[in-house]
C-alpha cells in the first residue's frame, strides 16, 4: 500500500503510505510553524548518493541567488526507505489462506522514488514520480488489518520492479491578490501561490496525496508504519495494489478552511493492478471539508470526509445465502455501491507535543475492494519532538488502533470467506487492537533511522490467534 507524507520538518510527518508529500496544496515555507500549515526499487547503495547530494546542492545554491519571489522553474528530489520487520512465533490453533504465519518470520521492503517537477504556464505545474520497489511484507502482507508496514505492497517481489507511480498536472486559479510562500519539495516548486485559490489536479496519483492528511500520522516512511495510522482504514480509497490510480481532484482553499472533491478510477478486481475500463460504473468519489484553527496559540485541524464507491463488488449477505463453503463472495459480484465517513483531527497540545485521532465508518455490506477489510476504525496517538531532550529533529510516537468489521462481514469471514487481508478459515470475532511505538533518530541532516514496536491483539478480527509482537527498523534518506 501506499500513501502521502508530510515533510520531516512537520511536527510529529506518505504516500505516502509510501507516499511523498501531499500534492494537493503545497505546504508553506516554514513547516515548523504550525500556524502556517496549509489546510520502491533497488537498494540505496545502488544509487550514487554523492552525486545526488552534489547536484541537489548546486540546485539549491542557484535558487538562493534569486529573489524570494522568484518562481522555481523545475526541481527534482529522491528518497529511499528500507524497512526490516520480525515477529516471533505466537499462539494460533488454526490458520487459513490469508493468515499471518504463526512461526517466527523476517521480511524486508525497499523503496526508491525519483521526483521531478516542471512549471508550465501561469499557475500550472507537471509532476512525475518514478518508483522502484522490492521486498515483501510479513506473511505476504496478510493476516493483520492494521498491517505493520506501510511500505509493504500486496504485490511483493524478489527483484526490483519499476512503476510510474504518479504523473499529473496541477492548475491553480487565484481568487484574490494575497500570496503565500511555497517551499521546494516533491510535488511543489518554490515560489508563491494564491492564499485564496481553486486547484485542479488531474492524472495519475494517490487519492491519499490529497485527502485524509494528518501532520502527525500520515507517512510510513517517516512516522508510524501501521496502515491504520497513515490513513483512515474504513475509507476504501480508490487505488490499485500499489496504492495509485487515475482521476481528478478539485479544491477550494481559503486561509482557514478548504473543501475538496475527487473522482477516481477503480480497479477491475479487488486489490488488483488493472483498472476497470467501465468508467461510468467503476469509480470512487470523495469529498472532504477541512477547518484550520487555533486553540489558544496552538494550531489544530479538523477534517470531515465522505466517500461513495461503485465497483464490481460481491455481497457478503448474498455469499452467506448460498450453500457454498467456504463462502465465496467473488461468485456474487455485480456493480454495487459502498459508502462511508471519516473524521480526522490533529492538535498541537504544547510546543513539540501533538495529538491526533481518526474515526471511520463504512456500511460494510459489500466486498472490500482496494485497501483493507476494516469497516469501523478508531485511532488515537501522540507525537513528541526531540527538542525536549535536545534532539530537535528526532521524534517519538505512540498510538493505539481499534479496527472492527460489520456484522455481516465477520459472519462471512467465520464461514471461510477471505478478504484483502483477512481469512483464517474461521474465526471467533473480536475487535483488532494494535499498539505502535517508534523512535525516529536523525543520523545526519536528511538521513534518519527508526526503531519500531507493534503489538497486535485479535489479528484480522480473530480472538483465537495472537497476540503478535512485531519488531521493526527503518532507514530513510531524502534529497
Q: Residue ranges of each PLM-predicted region?
A:
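Short loop/turn motifs that connect adjacent beta-strands in outer-membrane beta-barrel proteins
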Residues: 61-76, 88-89, 117-126, 174-197, ...
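Outer membrane beta-barrel transmembrane domains
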Residues: 290, 305-335, 356, 363, ...
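Transmembrane beta-barrel strands of outer-membrane/channel proteins
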Residues: 76, 80-84, 128-132, 200-204, ...
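Surface-exposed coil loops of outer-membrane beta-barrel proteins
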Residues: 142-166, 176-288, 327, 416-427
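Residues that define the transmembrane beta-barrel architecture of outer-membrane proteins
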Residues: 72, 106-112, 160-165, 242-246, ...
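Signature for the C-terminal beta-barrel architecture of outer-membrane proteins
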Residues: 227-345, 350-355, 359-366, 373, ...
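Transmembrane beta-strand segments of Gram-negative outer membrane beta-barrel proteins
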Residues: 68-95, 100, 198-200, 222-223, ...
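Residues on the lipid-exposed face of transmembrane beta-strands in outer-membrane beta-barrel proteins
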Residues: 78, 112-118, 167-171, 202, ...
